[in-house]
């Protein structure tokens, strides 16, 4: 139990279960040798994501910028308006042109295609 308490807490938002599974499988339980293990928390709606961020402590948020109803970019912007103390945020994007919008929302972008190496490096950099 004590080991789980020392794990990094990552919230992953996507309305697409396959995207969530791809991210978790790509990053794994440890994104880099010098970082602790990860405990993943998954959400499929923006409302639940906002509630969880409001009521829990996370080390990193990963949001799907291509979520259909409410994009991860919109969720990131809303969280920055509502919360005082946020962890780093990564937004998964489909287009390089979205990078400026992700920055405006207070996050960093990870452009598709999502490869394991790209995701591991982005997660490790955000957590350091």
Regions found by a protein language model. Give the residues of each.
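A generic structural motif
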Residues: 31-40
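His-Asp phosphorelay/catalytic-motif detector in bacterial-type signaling
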Residues: 57-59, 83-88
